[in-house]
Amino acid sequence: ENCGQRSVPASMLVNRGIGLTCVCVLRRFGCPPQFLSVLRAFHDGMTARVSFGGELSDPFEVLVGVKQGCVLAPVIFNLFLVAVTLFFRSNIQTSDGVPFNFRLDGNLFNLRRLQAKTKTSLDNIFDLQYADDAALPSHTPQGLQRGLAGLDDAYQRAGLSINTKKTVIMTTPVGTDPSTHPVITVQGHPLEAVKQFTYLGTVITSDLDLSIEIQNRIRQASAAFGRLTQRVFNNHSLSTSTKVAVYKAICVSTMLYGSEAWTPYQRHIKTLEQYHIRCLQRILGLRWWHRIPHVEIRKRANIQSAEVLMLQRQLRWVGHVIRMPSDRLPHRLLYGELVHGERGVGRPFKRFSDHIKATLRRCDISPASLEFLASDRDAWNLACKEGLARLAAQTERVAQERKARRTAAASSAPSGPSCPHCGRVCASDFGLRSHLRKHR
């Protein structure tokens, strides 16, 4: 899917918080005059002091922004960003976004439903915004430049400015050289072209590969594990169950952050499982030379494999998206496909829907009953819990069978031609001839 992604953090350099701009925005959203008067009274003449080293500085007047820690600050800022988004979308063209077709009736895995000419609907993605972090997707450099200019104009009208040092541009498809990227500017400043950038803690790459994101997640989890090692994991006063509970709440959550939207391959799952087992070995006080199987390690710690923990999050997220109202963007994207772009010749990238379908089959859940089960939250959670338990049992059974085959192969009597001089058994005639040179 050919699209340009950009990360646009807004810098709160000139936020005129409770100035005329904010008052106009709140009045536009229907706030009564009495509320606006009280709100301005809270902030007019506001002073602050800085605490450092147990001492307080002299009071100074605060002319911009809202009070730190005020319960109204998040609401005011959200309304502020809504006003910015509405103004931004009113000044861009429809073709500047990323169009996609969607159809909400039928089963998720029935791709033929999107081939209908009259039952599909069209929607556009213009921006993906979370607080003051925004990503602008576009299919053309011209549309991206117009969208960025419109967003910059909207921010300036609201008293904000785009931080050009933290704003980058990334182009797909795979193999696109950043040096050939079109020049996109903000207020005359060209933006840096990169092959990857971090958005909301997740590393997004131009080739859509999860390898870098997996390594980043493991680094973050390792840092969290290291900070807790002396206080928790090496603390002999704590029980193993307590240590595993802390590990699962902090380290596993960090390792699998954002995994709800992953489309992993087996190599990614293997990397996660290796790190997962290493952490459990350190918690249980085991070393590699103890030669304890992974199944036994997880059983002692009373925790599931990294794959099962990841699939649990993904199935829970899919059920949540399916239950969303029909006007929500995640719900439409799950049941849609991009208008532009083609899947290449040969084996294409695995889609998220393909991964979910394969997971349901491994859990003995019929893909055709996805919408029916997910519509009831309790029934869906129960089906996922039972299905993942069957998946974990099947995985454990396969691992034990492989171990039994390896043990049987190692203990079986060797067969093959033997050396007439020393009696050594060789694997083949060629090996025997090579060995006979030793007795010449």
Question: What residue spans do the PLM features occupy?
Answer:
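Short, well-structured alpha-helical segments
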Residues: 36-43
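Low-complexity intrinsically disordered segments
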Residues: 7-9, 15-18, 44, 182, ...
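Exposed beta-strand and adjacent loop surfaces of beta-rich binding modules
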Residues: 47
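Short linear motifs embedded in intrinsically disordered, charge-biased segments
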Residues: 31-35, 50-440
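Conserved catalytic palm subdomain of right-hand nucleotidyl-transferase polymerases, strongest
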Residues: 1-27, 71, 136
